[in-house]
A protein has these predicted regions:
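Residue-level signal for the short linker/turn that defines the boundary of a DNA-recognition helix
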Residues: 6, 16-17, 44-47
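DNA major-groove recognition helix of helix-turn-helix/homeodomain DNA-binding modules
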Residues: 27, 47-62
Length: 65
């Protein structure tokens, strides 16, 4: 099974946002955000990925290159 690493941390930090700001804006739990940012092969739900893509106005390929 191929494991993909998210660019979420890089994208979030590039916008100057804190994890807490992303949590409030997206409704995604802090634990989930931290897991996606720090664990290669994290397996977020489709809904979570869609929320992040919409919030940051990015494509799936930008989040998971």
């Amino acid at each position: 099974m191929v494991k993909y690493k998210s660019r979420l941390k890089e994208i979030r930090q590039g916008t100057g946002l804190t994890i807490d700001q992303v949590v409030v804006a997206t409704g995604i739990s802090k634990r989930t955000i931290i897991t996606i940012e720090n664990e290669e092969g994290a397996n977020p739900s489709v809904d979570t990925v869609k929320r992040l893509i919409k919030y940051f106005e990015i494509s799936f390929e930008e989040l998971y290159p």
